[in-house]
Amino acid sequence: MTNLRKTHPLMKIINSSFIDLPAPSNISSWWNFGSLLGICLIIQILTGLFLAMHYTSDTLTAFSSVTHICRDVNYGWLIRYMHANGASMFFICLFLHVGRGLYYGSYMFLETWNIGVLLLFAVMATAFMGYVLPWGQMSFWGATVITNLLSAIPYIGSDLVEWIWGGFSVDKATLTRFFAFHFILPFIIAAMAGVHLLFLHETGSNNPSGLCSDADKIPFHPYYTIKDILGVLLLILVLTTLVLFSPDLLGDPDNYTPANPLNTPPHIKPEWYFLFAYAILRSIPNKLGGVLALVLSILILAIVPLLHTSKQRSMMFRPFSQCLFWILVADLITLTWIGGQPVEHPFIIIGQLASILYFLLILVLMPITSILENNLLKW
């Protein structure tokens, strides 16, 4: 008799995705981040659901409702900090997942990669709107500054900003709609992640060597299920350590002050995971130019497959490209640091140089180095 998991209409989808899926035998721990992102999304949806039961999206009571969750709701503090720090873990996994894709040439799966880029935008939008909800000082001013950037769009800019605000400033209408979008977007992200997986399973996974692994496949279960479970346990260990010992480590103290439109904080800055893009935005004195650079800093990922000039897929056997890749990583860390600094002498020029280097590495240096490596190998 054929196994039920291979015949039942629902079970066979799960079977072909997580049990009998042929996987390369040599994929490393860098391939764990897909499943970790799935776990992060589940944690965020569940904690968010319980927070939404107690939160009120009204400018007068939003801040108080978050305080009420932390003080009066059973384990409310735990749910709130799991959600806030869960977002940080989500972005750590996202950056490592994208970095893995860049290093090992996973971007050659075009559909999977492009849906991944859209997912990155969707997660960033969701995180931004979530940061506005507690209605602290940094929530309010962050929302004001970032939405105001759209006014740089010619002709329709100012109308667009007022349309998003639902008035002439960030107010009750803005908070209510941000809450609505923040609630619905994770479910859209979950659906997109399903499509992301669908396209991945059309081609099969890449592997560290970048070579075709059809001749050497192993079943996903038990080999990679157990490996993924180890990754999940480590993720939960790091997240719970962060939540229980230092829940405010990655937050901003200004957000413990209720929003006040009459008092601007000395340094307006987003959460740490947006600082690299914020630094690129600030490094260009022109408003429209800054906004374009901000969008392009993420959108550039979509054109990475077009810039692949190497005859090898992975960077595993390309030492010069590896050097440039790690310079890019160092550059992004530098940009993240600069994004959190005030706009004054040494930081302005460092930010501008780091921004130029970021685009130069991806658009010019890496493709040229790949061609050089091709010639060195006499291919």
From Swiss-Prot:
It holds the Pfam family Cytochrom_B_C. It is found in: Mitochondrion inner membrane. It comes from the Eukaryota. Binds 2 heme b groups non-covalently. Coiled coil: none annotated. A ubiquinone binds at H201. One of its GO terms (cellular component) is respiratory chain complex III. InterPro entries: Cyt_b/b6_C, Cyt_b/b6_C_sf, Cyt_b/b6_N, Cytb/b6-like_sf, Cytochrome_b, Cytochrome_b_C_euk/bac, Cytochrome_b_N_euk/bac, Di-haem_cyt_TM. Heme b b566 binds at H97, H196. The chain crosses the membrane at residues 33-53, 77-98, 113-133, 178-198, 226-246, 288-308, 320-340, 347-367. Heme b b562 binds at H83, H182. It is a multi-pass membrane protein. Keywords: Electron transport, Heme, Iron, Membrane, Metal-binding, Mitochondrion, Mitochondrion inner membrane, Respiratory chain, Transmembrane, Transmembrane helix, Transport, Ubiquinone. Heme 1 (or BL or b562) is low-potential and absorbs at about 562 nm, and heme 2 (or BH or b566) is high-potential and absorbs at about 566 nm. The cytochrome bc1 complex contains 11 subunits: 3 respiratory subunits (MT-CYB, CYC1 and UQCRFS1), 2 core proteins (UQCRC1 and UQCRC2) and 6 low-molecular weight proteins (UQCRH/QCR6, UQCRB/QCR7, UQCRQ/QCR8, UQCR10/QCR9, UQCR11/QCR10 and a cleavage product of UQCRFS1). This cytochrome bc1 complex then forms a dimer. Belongs to the cytochrome b family. This is Cytochrome b.
